[in-house]
Amino acid sequence: MSITLSDSAAARVNTFLANRGKGFGLRLGVRTSGCSGMAYVLEFVDEPTPEDIVFEDKGVKVVVDGKSLQFLDGTQLDFVKEGLNEGFKFTNPNVKDECGCGESFHV
């Protein structure tokens, strides 16, 4: 089981953590939301809980709760710039369908 980051995602997370001045790593998860059922959760974490699973890729610690891991296993996180927009992009091999707006997905 794993979650990986592209070079650009790792660089962006490290920049955010440095600007923040503290932090253990990046928490990834899923929550019930949208028309397709699930949405990604991405936030910085100062300390993992005992129930968390911690991965490390390209020097970034990625924290995932056990319930979310089944939906995120094999996911790659990228940071992309498209025109004037930029943001994190998830490539998740478990996704079966996404809503039209791209805000939620179904596995």
Swiss-Prot record:
Keyword RNA-binding carried by entry: no
Entry note: cofactor: Binds 2 iron ions per dimer. The dimer may bind additional iron ions.
A single GO cellular-component term on record: cytosol
Pfam families: Fe-S_biosyn
GO molecular function, one term: ferrous iron binding
SUPFAM superfamilies assigned to the protein according to its UniProt record, in alphabetical order: HesB-like domain
Cofactors: Fe cation
Gene3D superfamilies, alphabetized: HesB-like domain (2.60.300.12)
Coiled-coil segments on the chain, per record: none
InterPro entries for this protein: Fe-S_cluster_asmbl/transfer (IPR050322), FeS_biogenesis (IPR000361), FeS_cluster_insertion (IPR016092), FeS_cluster_insertion_CS (IPR017870), HesB-like_dom_sf (IPR035903), IscA_proteobacteria (IPR011302)
This protein's UniProt keywords: Iron, Metal-binding
Upregulation: Repressed by IscR.
Top-level taxonomic group: Bacteria
The keyword Iron is assigned to this record: yes
Binding site for Fe cation: C35, C99, C101
GO BP, sorted A to Z: iron-sulfur cluster assembly
Record-stated family: Belongs to the HesB/IscA family.
Task performed by this protein: Is able to transfer iron-sulfur clusters to apo-ferredoxin. Multiple cycles of [2Fe2S] cluster formation and transfer are observed, suggesting that IscA acts catalytically. Recruits intracellular free iron so as to provide iron for the assembly of transient iron-sulfur cluster in IscU in the presence of IscS, L-cysteine and the thioredoxin reductase system TrxA/TrxB.
Note from the entry: 2 iron atoms may bind between dimers.
Binding partners and assembly: Homodimer; may form tetramers and higher multimers.
Name this protein carries in UniProt: Iron-binding protein IscA
Originating species: Escherichia coli (strain K12)
